[in-house]
Amino acid sequence: MAEGSRSPLRSFVEVAPGSHFPIQNLPFGVFRRRGSPEPEPPRPAVAIGDFALDLAAVSDAGLFHGPLLSASPCFRQETLNMFLGMGRPAWKEARATLQKILSADEPVLRDNEALKKKCLVPMSDTEMLLPITVGDYTDFFCSVHHARNCGFIFRGPQTPVNPNWFQLPVGYHGRASSVIVSGTDIIRPKGQGHPTGDSRPYFGPSKKLDFELEMAAIVGPGNELGKPIDINDAEEHIFGLMIMNDWSARDIQAWETIPLGPFLGKSFSTTVSPWIVTMDALKPFTCEAPKQEPEPLPYLAEKNHVNYDIPLEVWIKPKEQSEPSMVAKSNFKHLYWTLTQQLAHHTVNGCNLRPGDMFATGTLSGPETESLGCLLELTWNGQKEISVGNSTRKFLEDGDEVILTACCKGEGYNVGFGTCTGKVLPALP
């Protein structure tokens, strides 16, 4: 039976009602077993309930019978890059096979206790790793609400959004080497800040450390150098999405940005969630994308102009508090430029994308105050405070843990992303 928002699929693996990872999801990641007598290499997996399904073990057991995966070594690799490069036919074959062997009425894994124990690893026994080797990382700037607010803060109300913003998806080249997996601590960065009066620029730990609520798209096959990807073929090159926190040092960023854009204010750390939710799993949650005025140029005009209804939340847990507090709620559907428009624009000059490349949406702010996706907007660059439990914040303090989460609500099930977390540590001496 075809999947949909009313899918009757059930797994023999017990999945709690509120779980992010039912059989309708099956996001891909890479893990290492904790506590093994001998160090084990990283292994690809999908999440199902509170378990990681070891895809190397599934492959070794001969459970992939399809023409593309039966003889492929892609799930014996330490990252997902080889699998990503195989393209949508292989992704669909993998998803269909995994949903079949995990379904409640399929005995091949359900009734084989030894194989089941080998393949299903409790999440509590796993160390989640960065699931891909990120060759290149591009950060876009695609929320009109975020663009407008930043313009007001830094340039005033006259022209808060530059005219080119409505003509093309604005982006910049990020730093792939500092993309890290959820749970990795963040050392407060040092850099130059804006001079005050006649003084020289300030140098030291950032005084305006911020989070940015974003999502990152992971590239599949990609394209040859010099050969752009057509807008209406772009979805074939997007494997899935991860939650992303584009940590930002606003004082460093503000001083360095003119004329070439962000550098040290962004490049110190970018955190992503460990599970990649596939576009196939997100298909039931498509929604109409915002109307674009003026109409985009022909190379950005797509037949299927859609976004995804993905609710997102930001929580902060101060060091002195036992529980986190929610500080923002937004939604992916507010994105002005779609993922496919971002990818088509990225390649229109002939730039080649490769399997495992990553491009991010920019801060996913919405129209309401509660939907602003960073402290820069929530505090209007530190001009006001927000409540965080029984504390207040203008920017992040040492010991703060930032928790991003996202989850789509289907009919009787969720398709979630888990969490994307990081704790701020003091700057080095």
From Swiss-Prot:
EC number, UniProt record: 3.7.1.2
Pfam families named in the record: FAA_hydrolase, FAA_hydrolase_N
Keywords recorded for this protein, A-Z: Calcium, Hydrolase, Magnesium, Metal-binding, Phenylalanine catabolism, Tyrosine catabolism
Reactions that this protein is recorded to catalyse: 4-fumarylacetoacetate + H2O = acetoacetate + fumarate + H(+)
Active site: H146
UniProt pathway annotation: Amino-acid degradation; L-phenylalanine degradation; acetoacetate and fumarate from L-phenylalanine: step 6/6
Positions annotated to bind substrate: R155, Q253, T363
Cross-referenced InterPro entries: Fumarylacetoacetase, Fumarylacetoacetase-like_C, Fumarylacetoacetase_C_sf, Fumarylacetoacetase_N, Fumarylacetoacetase_N_sf
Gene3D superfamilies for this protein: Fumarylacetoacetase, N-terminal domain, Fumarylacetoacetase-like, C-terminal domain
GO molecular function: fumarylacetoacetase activity; metal ion binding
Annotated Ca(2+) binding sites: D139, E212, E214, D246
Reported cofactor(s): Ca(2+); Mg(2+)
GO biological process, one term: L-phenylalanine catabolic process
Binding site for Mg(2+): D246, K266, T270
Family note: Belongs to the FAH family.
PANTHER family reported in the protein's UniProt record: FUMARYLACETOACETASE
Protein purpose: Converts fumarylacetoacetate to acetoacetate and fumarate. Involved in tyrosine catabolic pathway. Catalyzes the final step in the tyrosine degradation pathway.
Protein name (record): Fumarylacetoacetase
Organism: Oryza sativa subsp. japonica (Rice)
Gene that this sequence comes from: FAH
